[in-house]
Amino acid sequence: MVRIEYRAHDGRARPAWLLMPEGDIDRPIPLVVSPHDRGESAKENALRWGDLPGEGDFAVIAPAGEGRRLGDYSWGAPGQISDLARMPSVATQHGVDVDPSQVYAVGGSMGGQETLLLVARDPGLLAGAIAFDPATDMARRYRDFRALRDGRWLQRLARVEIGGTPGQVPRAYAERSPDHYVRAIADSGVPLQLFWSTRDRIIRDQRLETGALVRRLRRDHPEARLWVFVGEWRHTAEMRASRRLPRALARFGLLPWADVPQLPRAAGRRA
């Protein structure tokens, strides 16, 4: 795992972590762009991947991100999504021979939110996307922050980053909300895997976020290439090399199924 730097949309130098398979590979390889969730750093997000890049011969780039005003709390800022779309070029500049037909996005929570926004805004970039327990409605997130231990602090950060409350700047919250882009996500043609939990204690009613997004996609766009998995796991717990992440990657051909461990004992269900 190597620390690199890239230039964000606002000109700031930001770190990213690059994971590569070992040894010489004489062909272009797939690249996974992995934005981090709100409660962790880019390095912590990179550590979730374990040895999977080596097992599947693909690279992962995990950028720190950069919002409108804040760094680690980008919450789907338009500039941040533009930066994510540039990650294949960043990886190439740092020696990765990227196969442009095999670029994927994988993220959890805020990273899942940004993964979905990337699908909506730059669909031609991606061969597939995976979102674990994503935030899909930023205005609801702002209101629901109150129920969290550090909720008032998170609301203050959101006002700084987004420019006010949902009542003051509703369009700014909408443009950071995947549920505002249902048609674009469906029309993108990007194969999409969504994972959400009925016992999430961070996004406490995922039925009204990811669940609602799924219902709209299936109702209005039944032809969308969509896999949905529902379980009872802790928030983003399944986005790990030891949990459901390998199965999600194998579904897109990034890992051999023979290398995928058995499902955890408390298996979820397919919706």
Q: What positions do the PLM features span?
A:
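Alpha/beta-hydrolase active-site loop
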Residues: W75-V96
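Mobile cap/lid helix-loop segments that gate and shape the active-site cleft of serine hydrolases
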Residues: G39, E44, R140-A184
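Primarily recognizes the serine-hydrolase "nucleophile elbow" in alpha/beta-hydrolase
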Residues: S101-L148
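N-terminal cap/lid segment of alpha/beta-hydrolase-fold proteins
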Residues: M1-D24
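Short, proline-enriched alpha-helix->beta-strand connector loops that line the catalytic pocket
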Residues: I185-L192
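C-terminal catalytic histidine-bearing segment of alpha/beta-hydrolase fold enzymes
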Residues: Q193-F195, I202, Q206-A271
